Amino acid sequence: MEAHLANETKHALWHNDHTKGLLHVVIPNAGLIAAGIDPALLILKKPGQRFKVEVQTRYHATGQCEPWCQVFAAYIPDNALTNLLIPKTEPFVSHVFSATHNSGGLILSLPVYLSPGLFFDAFNVVAIRINTGNRKHRDICIMYAELIPNGTRYFADGQRVLLLCKQLIAYIRCTPRLASSIKIYAEHMVAAMGESHTSNGDNIGPVSSIIDLDRQLTSGGIDDSPAETRIQENNRDVLELIKRAVNIVNSRHPVRPSSSRVASGLLQSAKGHGAQTSNTDPINNGSFDGVLEPPGQGRFTGKKNNSSASIPPLQDVLLFTPASTEPQSLMEWFDICYAQLVSGDTPADFWKRRPLSIVPRHYAESPSPLIVVSYNGSSAWGGRITGSPILYHSAQAIIDAACINARVDNPQSLHVTARQELVARLPFLANVLNNQTPLPAFKPGAEMFLNQVFKQACVTSLTQGLITELQTNPTLQQLMEYDIADSSQTVIDEIVARTPDLIQTIVSVLTEMSMDAFYNSSLMYAVLAYLSSVYTRPQGGGYIPYLHASFPCWLGNRSIYLFDYYNSGGEILKLSKVPVPVALEKVGIGNSTQLRGKFIRSADIVDIGICSKYLPGQCYAYICLGFNQQLQSILVLPGGFAACFCITDTLQAALPASLIGPILDRFCFSIPNPHK
C-alpha cells in the first residue's frame, strides 16, 4: 500500500486539474508470468539490486502516446492482498489478525487521461514495462475499457472491517501481559459493537473467523447495482453498527429543550418570531451584513404588531459547545486501541482499518485478473475523500448512442455534423474520427496490429534481402578469419552439403518468428537503432533506444554487429536469449579481405550464456545472424562462410512511413528539442 500512497502523493503534487486521474492496481503473479516476466527477478536479494516500472498511455488510433514515466511500485512475493487489507502489527506483536493465504503480486498505480466531465476513451491503452536488468523486453498492454471498473465494491468490504475488530478484541482478551488501558479500550470496542460478551470471551474467542480474501474478490457486486442495495442477512450486523453510531452521535450532543426560541432555518425562524414584537433591544446592525434578514421583517414572519414578546439577542441564536475528545464510535475505539497496541500508527494502516474496494478486472493478455483497489480517504479512482466515490466515465455509451441514432456501424461513418457534435462534447475524438488514422479505430487489437506490422516488415525485408543476395552470389566465401585444421575438413564438407537446407530452414524460422522471439531478437534491436538514428520527432528532437542491448549498435560505428545464435544440427532453434554484440574488423589476408571478430563486453549486460564463448563461425554447432546500425546484415555458417547483404531499402519499402513515429514512441525514449 505504501507504493499506492507514494504515487498518490506524487500525483497530487504534480497535477492539480482533472485531466489526469489515477488508478491503484495489483497485478498478481499469474499476470506477470502470462506477460513473460519471472516474478523471481522482482525479489531484491542483493544490496543495490532493484527493478524499475514505467508506464505509458497510448492514445486511440492516432499512434500518439505519452512519454514513458516511472511510477512507484512494490513487489510482494506472497500474500499481496494481505498487505493491502490487513493492518501491520509486526514487529511489536504478531498473530493479531488472520486471513487466508493469497498470491503475491506487483503493487503500482496507473495514470488515466480524462476529458472534461471525467470521461475517458475506452480504446486508450496503458502499457506497463518492468525493467529487471536482464534485457528481455515485454510490455503489459491493457485497454482502458478492460482496466477501469463501472463502480466500487465498498459494501462488500464491511464484513472484513467487522472481523478485524473481532480479531483484535480476541487477541487482547487472550493475551494477559498487556497494558490495562488496552484492555479497557477493547471493552469499549465491545460496547460499541453492541454485543453481550461474557468476561471470558465466549462469543469472541482466540479462534475467531478468518478473513477470506478470495471471497472478498468474488462475493457481492458493484455498490450501485440493484441487487446489492437489498439488505442481506450477512450484512445486518454492519447495519446495526451504523445505527448504533448514529445513537452515539445523538448522545454526544443531545437536543436540549429550552424556553427561548432558537431559529434553525427560515421556517423555524418564522415560527419563533410569530409571537414577537419589534420592540426589542438594540442589535448590532453589522451582524446582519450578508444573508440575514431584519428581525421581524423576514419573508415568513408575521406583522410587527401581532405579538408582545421580545426577540432574544442575535448573539444567543447559535449555540456552540466544545466537541468531546473521548472516542465514541467503534472505529474511533478501534483506532486508539490499535495505535496503543503497536505503539503508533501510519497512514497506510489507517486506510486498511476503513472500508476498501477491490474490483477484479480481466484483460486479454492474461487469464488471471488484475485487481483495482480504492481507499476510503483516497483521491484516486473510487476514493471517497469527497464523500462519494470518484468515478471515471466511459465515452463509449455516448458514441454508441450517436451511431444507433444515425444507423451506422462505425463512428467514422457518421455524418460530418454528428461527428462535430461528438467532438464538441468529447474533444479527444477530434483525431479518432478522422478516417486517415494510422491505426485501426474502435478496434481492441490496434496495438497488436502495430506490432505485427512492425515485425512483418522487419522479417520480410530480412528474408527478401537474404534470398536476393544468394540468388546473386550463390557461392559463400569464407569471410571470417579462421584457420581450418585438416581434422575438421569432414565437418566442413558436411556443412557445405547441408548449406542449401540450412539456409532454407533459417528463412522458415525467421518467417514464423513469434512476437516474443522478435521482441528479443537482434533484428528488432538493430532496426530500432537504425530508425532512431535517422528519424526525428515531428515537434523536433530525436530518439534513444530504450533497450540497453541496442546501445553498442546504436552508439558504435558500422563495425559493431548484434548477433543471434541458432543451432546447426537437428531442428534449428534460436539459442541466444539476448543479442550478442560483436565487433567485426577487416583484415587483409594475401590479396583478399576477411573479418576478424571480437566480443563487446559491458558491465550492465548479464551473462549471455555459452553463445558468448564462440565468435560467429568459430564453432560448428552455431549459425549466426547479425546486423549493424546501417542494417548491413551477415549470415555466418560454421567455418566462417558468410553471406553479406543490406536490408535498408527493403525495410523502407515494407514499413509504412506513418507507423515509424508510433513505433519509435513506443520502443524508444524521446529526446526533446533543445531549441524549444
Swiss-Prot record:
Residues 253-264 have a biased composition (Low complexity). Signal peptide: none annotated. Transmembrane segments: none annotated. It is found in: Virion; Host nucleus. Residues 253-308 are annotated as: Disordered. GO terms for biological process: chromosome organization. Residues 275-287 have a biased composition (Polar residues). Keywords: Capsid protein, Host nucleus, Late protein, Viral genome packaging, Viral release from host cell, Virion. Belongs to the herpesviridae CVC1 protein family. Interacts (via C-terminus) with capsid vertex component 2/CVC2. Capsid vertex-specific component that plays a role during viral DNA encapsidation, assuring correct genome cleavage and presumably stabilizing capsids that contain full-length viral genomes. This is Capsid vertex component 1.
